[in-house]
């Protein structure tokens, strides 16, 4: 679906929403609900007047008390946080977890002492200067709104008025803050807090309806179309940052649905109906620290160590599972969620209390599909099985939308027990030298470099220093973050942002095939085409065929692999071992390839300069494997076979290539693959069957 189609859909939805909104406003004082609004996940949801009673954001006091009886173990942990744990360390309890826990216990048990303490914590925000710009001012409003609603009787009239004033001043000061709807901050830094504050103060702050309506219209006309475009299939083009904002935004969606029956989900079904499944695929196999799952690295941030966003990802999936509870795929996600039933941060016990609903039917996880495609972001995820020791694969070939994306089309991840091929670099400072010259650049990824000595890069993340020539993909957008404001802006400059195409996707069970065209991600002055075809033969073999044509034969081409650990062995056959996992790397083409292992002090060095990180936030690839042809040519073909195994495995079948004027054939054990040289295509012979490689997207 094109960007213009999304905008047309948004205008229709806006008209319907304004009509329904007007109907609700007229009937606000009535107790009977207005006409039902269609809902994708559940039936019988109606638009209705907002209750005048407090609490209302998460339910009435009686409903919360009933929930405490239904979920006694989780509620006991909430009480423990409220009464015994101090806020501070985000791996124990942050201010948000502490405040909402205290407020819930106040509402459920009538604990006035906790109530007063929670109000005092809220007043520290209210009496402080309003935060403006790229700050989490929406979080501040949300924390205060939850305490306001759950502890309403404990607020004095003066304190309530101060909150209303603080809320209004925050909104007025941030009219021009966080306006980019492809960026996490529109949702997490800003509007979830606006929404909670408006519903909490609906009858007391006369500006609440106006503020909420502005947020609603911005969501309908700009944010929902962005979710449909860049989030089609449930992945999110911004990457890893979805783990930072999706929980807060879906928290608001649930509050809006509960308070007045407004359904945010129906406005972007391509995103919301697929998000929980995509999130499940965006976790490496294996249960790790604090009984959590590690999200895969996508763009900025890599999730190498346990952090609170792992609990956010779990809770966001739970919210969607609860809503789409009758959908078989979401019942499978529920089974997946139940393998990590308790949040990893003690202070997040309230998340288990509110969102973990064990009454949802469990689906058959082991029988579920083994791959998923998110066309909006250009992500393919795949596994060998749903066992915890499965081989994992991720491939990116998608368009540009916003900051936090990397110049990494054609990049892939492989994991077996541990990460074997990952994302290079350390994310610790946005816009710093390491960030601009290494982390976000193609050189930090498993893709292709084409070195034009005259190529230059400018205006990346407002960095004022020198920018190196890594030979990678270009950064040629009007905004220094490479960001489009919204779908209209993206569509207006489509020729700049539409930089890659997923050409084929097919999963036949025994193998998965993907193909992508990454050509437009590079400067047209140096590259004519770069296409990548990958066949994942389960359980652990990857055949990667790349066609690359440069404008000048002397532009050196380099096939890159970001290896988790320095390889052993001797080129063209290398072995990467990380913990219990092992990756065998066979360079089949080009013949007599030049292979360089960039490790140690050379890992972050290119062009005679080092861009080593000043901080380490977690384990990252320790070797950059570079494979180049031994002689210059305009056209080069790269053929690699990567096999992921247990570290106890000592050898794998050797790949043999046969090259003709029109085809490249790779024989690997009982499998044979043929790739055409003049265009993306070919066939696979496996298990006695010869099958053409798909020429299009073939979804399940």
Where do the language-model regions lie?
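Trp/Gly-enriched beta-strand surface patches
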Residues: 571-624
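Carbohydrate-active enzyme catalytic cores, enriched for enzymes
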Residues: 244-421, 619, 628-638, 652-700
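Catalytic and substrate-binding regions of extracellular carbohydrate-active enzymes
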Residues: 341-582, 589, 602, 632-640, ...
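Aromatic-lined, polymer-binding surfaces characteristic
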Residues: 54-58, 67-280, 288
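Bacterial N-terminal signal peptides that target proteins for export
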Residues: 2-11
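Bacterial N-terminal signal peptides
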Residues: 10-20
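Extreme N-terminal leader/anchor segments
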Residues: 37-73
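Bacterial Sec-dependent N-terminal signal peptides
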Residues: 24-41
